[in-house]
UniProtKB/Swiss-Prot annotation:
NCBIfam families: dltC, PRK05087.1. It is found in: Cytoplasm. This is D-alanyl carrier protein. GO terms for cellular component: cytoplasm. Pathway: Cell wall biogenesis; lipoteichoic acid biosynthesis. PROSITE patterns: CARRIER (PS50075). The keyword Phosphoprotein applies. Belongs to the DltC family. Its main location: cytoplasm. The modification O-(pantetheine 4'-phosphoryl)serine is found at S36. The lineage of its organism: Bacteria, Bacillati, Bacillota, Bacilli, Bacillales. It comes from Staphylococcus aureus (strain Mu3 / ATCC 700698). Transmembrane segments: none annotated. The gene is dltC. Pfam families: PP-binding. 4'-phosphopantetheine is transferred from CoA to a specific serine of apo-DCP.
Length: 78
């Protein structure tokens, strides 16, 4: 499975919503797809399943606003 697909699957799992895979440009926070509690869960899952550590200090809601932006940010960190 390619990295992008792994990230989108993980995001869909945390969000409990496949819209993140169907529309990777959806504004996940603005649309209420992911809340702050799920954000913490997402960061933990990224660390556990992708072995990429993202501290809450490195997390910027604007830079992580869409699934596509999350994939890009994680590609830079891996």
């Amino acid at each position: 499975m390619e990295f992008r697909e792994q990230v989108l699957n993980l995001l869909a799992e945390v969000a409990e919503n496949d819209i993140v895979k169907e529309n990777p440009d959806v504004e996940i926070f603005e649309e209420g797809i992911i809340d702050s509690f799920q954000t913490v869960g997402l960061l933990l899952e990224i660390q556990n399943k992708l072995d990429i550590e993202v501290s809450i200090m490195d997390f910027d809601r604007d830079e992580w606003a869409t699934p596509n932006k999350i994939v890009e940010a994680l590609e830079e960190l891996r």
